[in-house]
Amino acid sequence: MRHAKSAYPDGIADHDRPLAPRGIREAGLAGGWLRANLPAVDAVLCSTATRARQTLAHTGIDAPARYAERLYGAAPGTVIEEINRVGDNVTTLLVVGHEPTTSALAIVLASISGTDAAVAERISEKFPTSGIAVLRVAGHWADVEPGCAALVGFHVPR
């Protein structure tokens, strides 16, 4: 999931930017969509940026969260390394991050087999704030690598 729409207050460092009112509303919508359409989230991996943390808070998802500084400005490989650290007791993981990493990660993880080509194309064109890519992974989180997942959905709450 990409963080929700952020504000741009003067004098605030990028890492510390808060959500805009629209972002607060859309993060809530994202949480509602996640609860209605996917299995319960067991764990969250979230950027330490204020807007990412606030996005998670406003989704209402109350799963245990690990905040990783490395997710801010990360390359897809760095996010994969963080995913590889997730325990096998987790079946549904929510990753809250930033662009352009979130879209690149979804495309990098997507395999040809099982991936919805139309979804991949939509993500390649634009991954708006609060966008949620849904990937299915078989096996252990420690084994997640490029091409290991089926990209099966994409939702932008509005």
Swiss-Prot record:
* Span of the signal peptide: none
Keywords carried by this UniProt record: Hydrolase
The EC number(s) this enzyme carries: 3.1.3.-
Q: Can you name one GO molecular function term for this protein? A: hydrolase activity
Output the superkingdom of the source species: Bacteria
- Tell me the InterPro entries matching this sequence: His_Pase_superF_clade-1 (IPR013078), His_PPase_superfam (IPR029033), Mito_Ser/Thr_phosphatase (IPR051021)
An example of a Pfam family matching this protein is: His_Phos_1
**UniProt record similarity statement:** Belongs to the SixA phosphatase family.
Q: Which PANTHER family match?
A: PHOSPHOGLYCERATE MUTASE-RELATED (PTHR20935), SLL1549 PROTEIN (PTHR20935:SF1)
- Protein name stated in the entry: Uncharacterized protein MT1313
